[in-house]
Each structure stands twice: as structure tokens, then as C-alpha cells.
């Protein structure tokens, strides 16, 4: 890590004035880098982390999950269907353009056309420009999650992204896993500008001199994001001083990090559910509820949480973690090998069958090891698994094609709400609305769809919770998916890199506010 006194600091010291701010140059090692620079191409942790660095949302969560004003200074409800947002004035994009309501409306419309994000904004009718610095978000019906959804509106530079590129293609086009102007060009309002990017090698960021948030104490002027897939290699880079911060820290490495001089380990409980989906379209056996139940009973997820995750995870029996509106304390993990064998026999598969499985090897903590363990467990009920693991850059295109019989996916609820988990993972797939966008199990239950639709217009918290709990019970009984665990979070950093105030349960550290002291 390099520390350098800013020109302002030098000038102040030359004038005999005290100034303790230092400009930091740090390197952060993650398990993988963002797959694209288009903030709407993929709904993933890597994309959202990039968004919080290069863009700003209208509002964001603080560490207590309270809403914090960002590009919207304030907001108020106009009527049951309308929330009004008052925008900050004088906010500049990296291009030099000034942010206005036009950019917010343009971004909202683009989100509604994004295959990955449209489901979040399906309850909305439109965004309306009231004046240059006022925008109304209008929902189709009463909707209780407007502010939660607004955390996903990162205003884009509409002038920068409008028109044609050198190949005659629309600059605003969203191309999944392909080449587009937005996937390689970026202009936001955030604390950092992307100055260089080599996919799979590094992304270089430089602090935006005209950043609007002058109250931020962040003093990182240069940041390099470096992907290091292997857990042990990532830790070694931190301990040797090659990098200044790493994420995640695998459970096996916690003691190494905690025991190192000048290094801190910061942990938080997590709400990201890790699951396997069972593709009913690719393997006829998985259409039988008894087979799906047998698979759930055969996978010892409590053992995975204890041994592979070293206790740094909570075994799950449902989608919703404790504290979410749909969480049902009665839906517990249910490993029972004998029960699994009985169900296989009852379904006519006593001798088992074969299936394919895919999983990433650098997206979730110990993802490949978990997949290998699950495959071994399924062999005990006669299911022969052909497992393939791959880096996430190759994994997501395969997942989007639902290219296996069982597929690993983790999900952190975008709105910190139970309904979001179902909307993306277990509702009936609908390309028009975006519902079920990541439902490669092709599970479809009209009652689940109906309950979620009703929950999205229910403003009574108790009634809404009852609807969401009923959804979890149906998914549990149908064995709609294989719940594994809720993944906890861990970061490691040099002690003078103060990450505790910027990390959060969403797993999007607010690097713009990061303070680094001189050693």
C-alpha cells in the first residue's frame, strides 16, 4: 500500500496548518472481478459492488438497514401509489455532465427492460419527471417496498449512454454475456472512476475529483481490484503485504488471519441463501416430488455447514433467514438418509439414476467443495452425479441456459425481503415480467405465484408475513429447491485499513468512505 500526501495537504502544511488526511493507494483482492461494466447486465454481487463504487443509488442502506439519503436528498409519499424523490443539485457524472431527473427516468426505464432487473421493478408503472430535480415513482398498486427498490436505482449518465457506438449499435443496449458499449464504457456519479480494466486480471479505480459527497471521510485516491480465485493464495497475498484487503476470507483461513500481526478479521452474519436447483425440464426424474424430496433428505446440509464451512454458516430449511417476514421457525433442515432411500424406492428409483450438476468455483465460499460433497452424498441413494465446476465468468452463461440437472445458486434478497427470493428463484419463469429469472429448476406453482403477487400489494405487515410464510411452507413440502445454508461474511485487512465502518450484511463495502491511516 502506498500513502501519499495530497497537493492540498502539502499546501496546508507549507502554510503551517495541520492536516491529517492522507491519500491512500490500496489493492483489494476479491475471489472474482465484475463480469461487465454495465450495471444492468447481470444482477449479481460483483455488479452491485461495482455500482456502489462507480455510481450512487437514490438511497442506500446503512449498517442498521436504515435508509440513507444519497442522490435523493429527501422523499415523501404523495399518495398510495406515488413516492416523490427530491434530487441533489450540482451532482456531476464522470463525463462532466450534470445529473438531473432526466437521468433518473432514463435509468428507471432501462431497468424495466433489463432481463435481470425487470422483476424488481415490475410492480412499478412509471417514473415521472416533475421538474429537473424531482422524480415521482408510481406503482401499479399500493406497494410496500418502494424505498427498498430505490436502492437499486443508480442513475446512469443518459447523455453518455445515448446515440450509436462506432459499430452503429445503440449505446444503451443491454447485451447479456456479450459485447456492448455499456459493458466496456462507464460514467457514473460515484466516488471512483474506472481508469483501466483487464478482465480476470485487475480493475483500476481513481477517486473522482468532482465527487459530490464532500462530507465523506474516505481518503482512498487509487484502488486496484484484483481477482484471486484460490482462498489460500488470497490470504497469503494479504499476509505478505501484497494486498491491503481481501474478501471473502474462507472459514479455514480465519485463524491464520486473526493470528497475524497487523491484520484484522471482520465478520458479520449473512442472509445469502446457498441452494441447488433441480431442473425439471432436463431430467424427468426431477419432476417427481418424491425424488426432489429424497435429494433434499440425502444432502446433509448441517454437516456441510459444520465441516466444510467450519460453522461459519447456518444450515437452512427454507429461503428466508431469521428476521425476514417469511421466516418460519418450524421449517428446519431435514437430513435423513433412510427417509431419502424410502422416497427413492417409492418413486420407482430404488436403483437410482444419473444427473448432471454444475457449480462455480470462485463465486460462493467453498462452492466447489460443497458441490463435491453434495455429489458424494447423492451417491448414497444411487444418484450418479456428473459434476463440473468452473469460474463464474464461464458459469453464469451456462446457468442462464439452465445447462444441467442440478445447478448451484446463491441469493441475497435485493430488497431485504422474503418475496424477492421467491420472485427470482421459485416463481414461474416469465420473460415478460422477469419473474423466475433465475428459476432453472423450472418449478411452477400457481398458488406460490398468487401469494407473492398478493404479498406485493399487502401493506398490513401481519397479513403479509402470513402470506410469505405460507409460500415457504409450500416450497418446503414441494422440495422446490435444495436449501444448503445462509453464508456468513468475512473480510480481512491491514489494521490501518479501517473496513469495519464500511462493510455491511449486503456485502457491498462502501469503498468511497474507506479511511486508511499511515502506518
Segments (PLM) and residue ranges:
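Short helix-initiation/N-cap motifs at beta->coil->alpha
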Residues: 132, 187, 225-236, 248-252, ...
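Short, well-ordered beta-strand elements
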Residues: 24-35, 73, 82-85, 104-107, ...
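Detector for C-terminal structural segments
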Residues: 26, 198-202, 207, 274, ...
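Aromatic- and charge-enriched surface segment that lines or borders ligand/interaction sites
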Residues: 73-117, 130, 136-138, 237, ...
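Short, solvent-exposed loop/beta-turn-alpha elements that line the ligand-binding surface or hinge
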Residues: 46-77, 153-189, 211-219, 256-268, ...
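Ligand-site clamp/hinge motif
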Residues: 210-256, 384
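Alpha-helical secondary-structure segments
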Residues: 101-107, 132-138, 190-191, 219-222, ...
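Surface-exposed binding/hinge segments that line
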Residues: 76, 119-170
Amino acid at each position: 500500500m502506498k500513502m501519499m500526501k495530497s497537493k492540498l495537504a502539502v499546501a496546508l502544511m507549507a502554510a503551517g496548518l495541520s492536516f491529517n488526511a492522507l491519500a491512500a493507494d490500496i489493492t483489494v483482492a476479491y475471489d472474482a472481478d465484475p463480469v461487465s461494466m454495465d450495471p444492468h447486465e447481470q444482477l449479481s454481487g460483483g455488479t452491485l459492488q461495482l455500482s456502489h463504487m462507480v455510481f450512487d443509488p437514490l438511497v442506500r442502506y446503512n449498517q442498521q438497514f436504515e435508509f440513507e439519503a444519497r442522490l435523493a436528498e429527501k422523499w415523501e409519499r404523495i399518495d398510495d401509489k406515488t413516492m416523490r424523490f427530491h434530487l441533489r443539485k450540482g451532482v456531476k457524472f464522470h463525463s462532466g455532465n450534470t445529473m438531473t431527473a432526466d437521468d433518473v427516468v432514463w435509468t428507471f426505464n432501462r431497468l424495466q427492460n433489463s432481463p435481470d432487473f425487470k422483476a424488481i421493478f415490475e410492480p412499478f408503472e412509471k417514473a415521472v419527471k416533475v421538474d429537473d430535480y424531482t422524480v415521482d415513482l408510481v406503482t401499479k398498486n399500493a406497494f410496500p417496498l418502494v424505498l427498498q427498490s430505490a436502492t437499486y436505482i443508480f442513475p446512469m449518465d443518459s447523455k453518455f449512454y445515448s446515440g450509436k457506438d462506432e459499430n452503429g449499435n445503440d449505446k444503451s443496449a443491454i447485451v447479456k454475456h456479450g459485447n456492448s458499449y455499456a459493458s466496456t464504457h462507464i460514467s457514473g456519479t460515484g466516488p471512483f472512476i474506472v481508469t483501466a480494466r483487464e478482465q480476470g486480471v485487475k480493475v483500476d479505480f481513481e477517486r473522482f475529483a468532482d465527487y459530490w459527497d464532500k462530507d465523506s471521510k474516505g481518503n482512498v485516491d487509487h484502488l486496484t481490484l484484483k481477482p484471486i480465485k484460490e482462498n489460500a493464495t488470497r490470504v497469503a497475498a494479504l499476509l505478505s503485504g501484497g494486498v491491503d484487503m481481501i474478501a471473502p476470507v474462507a472459514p479455514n483461513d480465519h485463524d491464520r488471519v486473526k493470528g497475524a500481526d497487523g491484520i484484522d478479521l471482520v465478520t458479520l452474519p449473512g442472509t445469502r441463501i446457498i441452494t441447488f436447483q433441480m431442473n425439471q425440464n432436463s431430467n424427468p426424474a426431477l419432476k417427481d416430488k418424491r425424488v426432489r424430496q429424497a435429494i433434499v433428505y440425502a444432502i446433509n446440509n448441517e454437516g456441510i455447514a459444520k465441516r466444510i464451512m467450519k460453522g461459519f454458516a447456518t444450515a437452512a430449511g427454507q429461503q428466508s433467514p431469521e428476521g425476514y417476514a417469511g421466516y418460519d421457525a418450524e421449517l428446519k433442515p431435514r437430513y435423513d438418509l433412510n427417509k431419502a432411500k424410502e422416497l427413492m424406492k417409492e418413486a420407482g428409483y430404488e436403483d437410482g439414476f444419473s444427473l448432471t450438476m454444475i457449480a462455480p468455483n470462485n463465486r460462493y465460499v467453498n462452492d466447489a467443495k460443497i458441490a463435491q460433497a453434495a455429489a458424494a452424498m447423492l451417491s448414497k441413494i444411487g444418484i450418479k452425479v456428473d459434476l463440473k465446476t468452473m469460474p463464474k465468468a464461464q458459469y453464469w452463461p451456462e446457468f442462464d441456459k439452465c445447462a444441467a440437472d442440478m445447478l448451484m445458486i446463491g441469493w441475497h434478497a435485493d430488497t431485504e425481503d422474503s418475496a424477492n427470493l421467491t420472485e427470482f428463484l421459485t416463481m414461474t419463469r416469465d420473460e415478460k415480467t422477469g419473474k423466475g429469472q433465475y428459476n432453472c429448476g423450472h418449478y411452477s406453482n400457481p398458488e406460490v405465484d398468487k401469494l407473492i403477487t398478493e404479498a406485493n400489494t399487502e401493506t398490513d405487515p401481519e397479513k403479509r408475513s402470513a402470506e410469505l410464510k405460507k409460500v415457504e411452507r409450500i416450497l418446503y413440502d414441494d422440495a422446490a429447491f435444495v436449501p444448503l445454508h445462509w453464508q456468513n461474511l468475512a473480510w480481512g485487512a491491514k489494521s490501518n485499513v479501517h473496513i469495519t465502518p464500511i462493510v455491511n450484511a449486503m456485502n457491498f463495502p462502501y469503498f468511497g468512505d474507506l479511511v486508511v491511516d499511515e502506518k
